[in-house]
Amino acid sequence: MADDGVNPKAFPLADTNLSQKLMDLVQQAMNYKQLKKGANEATKTLNRGISEIIVMAADAEPLEILLHLPLLCEDKNVPYVFVRSKAALGRACGVTRPVIAASITQNEGSQLKSQIQKIKEDVEKLLI
């Protein structure tokens, strides 16, 4: 298990640069009330069809507790990406606890639309 002990099932894993952009976007989404925190809420947004992108933590223990999300994302055609740290994701979500999954939701007339679109394209490049 090379690569700092990150589970190989955590694919696609964002690099440092993309991780930073994702964390910034998550923070802004929180400010605009376009963020759902946690695996269960992320699942709900996918089922309701209101999710733009799913961000998951690669260091979730055990990782299997959120591996249903990539399958659901593929069914719903929603991009998803892993970041290295659940603690960093928690901080970006504005909570003191670690967060293993977050969903950025759709909002008509949102100021984040262009940023979300750009990040989606970057994430989709990882899958190629």
Swiss-Prot record:
Taxonomically, the superkingdom here is Eukaryota
Recorded GO CC terms:
box C/D methylation guide snoRNP complex; nucleolus; precatalytic spliceosome; small-subunit processome; U4/U6 x U5 tri-snRNP complex
The cross-references to InterPro entries, in alphabetical order and at most eight, read: eL8/uL1-like, H/ACA_rnp_Nhp2-like, Ribosomal_eL30-like_sf, Ribosomal_eL8-like_CS, Ribosomal_eL8/eL30/eS12/Gad45, Ribosomal_eL8/Nhp2
* Chief location of this protein within or outside the cell: nucleus
What is one Gene Ontology biological process annotated in the Swiss-Prot or TrEMBL record? maturation of SSU-rRNA
Compartmental location: Nucleus, Nucleolus
Molecular function (GO) terms for this protein are: RNA binding
Keywords assigned by UniProt, alphabetized? mRNA processing, mRNA splicing, Nucleus, Ribonucleoprotein, RNA-binding, Spliceosome
Per its database record, what is this protein's job? Binds to the 5'-stem-loop of U4 snRNA and may play a role in the late stage of spliceosome assembly. The protein undergoes a conformational change upon RNA-binding.
Return the similarity comment.
Answer: Belongs to the eukaryotic ribosomal protein eL8 family.
In Swiss-Prot or TrEMBL terms, this protein is called Small nuclear ribonucleoprotein associated homolog 13
Source organism per entry reads: Caenorhabditis elegans
Gene this chain is encoded by: snu-13
